[in-house]
Amino acid sequence: MTVRPIVIHGDPVLHNPTQLVTEDVSELQELIADMYETMDVANGVGLAANQIGVSKRIFVYDCPDDEGVMHKGCFINPVLETSEIPETMPADDGSDEEGCLSVPGEGFPTGRAHWAKVTGLNEKGEEVSVEAEGFLARCFQHEVGHLDGFLYTDVLIGRWKRMAKKAIKANGWTEPGLTWMPGEDEDPFGHDA
């Protein structure tokens, strides 16, 4: 397993839809293992393949639900269903706060559906379907968004969208080729402090 650099906002691999996986899952095992390792070292709860520069429709997760129970898995060619996404401003009390390894160190309230269901293949090539509510549902929506070519900053509204644009510009995340290396660079979210 190898920790790979995480691509930062501004790179085209993050802003374009990923490609459907057509190869046999046996050919993906090294990539999937690297994704898990990178996510773990980065202290993330999810990681999409394009976040490490690979334009394939795959994501991994190791995320708690609202009761603190951890859920770990991999989806290949995931299909997402959700309940209605609220059109109101997200809560400003921290409950809707979202961050992203590709927007390092930033976090903004993001409106998401409370319920989500993801269907696809796991790393063994078996068809799986997982339903989730709350934080785990948020994780699924976030990761599938990556695979569709969107970052969470693209779905922000109101002042949060304006603040995100300012942060992206201030950090110089408007051009391709920027990365950070989990385990080597300082943790942008302060987990190693």
From Swiss-Prot:
Gene3D superfamilies: Peptide deformylase
Superkingdom to which the source organism belongs: Bacteria
Top EC category: hydrolase
One record GO biological process: translation
Keywords: Hydrolase, Iron, Metal-binding, Protein biosynthesis
Cofactor note: Binds 1 Fe(2+) ion.
EC number in record: 3.5.1.88
Reaction catalysed by this enzyme: N-terminal N-formyl-L-methionyl-[peptide] + H2O = N-terminal L-methionyl-[peptide] + formate
Residues annotated to bind Fe cation: 100, 142, 146
Cofactor: Fe(2+)
Encoding gene per record: def2
Active site (UniProt): 143
Example of a GO MF term: metal ion binding
Pfam family membership, one: Pep_deformylase
Similarity-based family: Belongs to the polypeptide deformylase family.
Membrane-traversing stretches: none
Species name: Corynebacterium glutamicum (strain ATCC 13032 / DSM 20300 / JCM 1318 / BCRC 11384 / CCUG 27702 / LMG 3730 / NBRC 12168 / NCIMB 10025 / NRRL B-2784 / 534)
Protein's name according to its UniProt entry: Peptide deformylase 2
Function according to Swiss-Prot or TrEMBL: Removes the formyl group from the N-terminal Met of newly synthesized proteins. Requires at least a dipeptide for an efficient rate of reaction. N-terminal L-methionine is a prerequisite for activity but the enzyme has broad specificity at other positions.
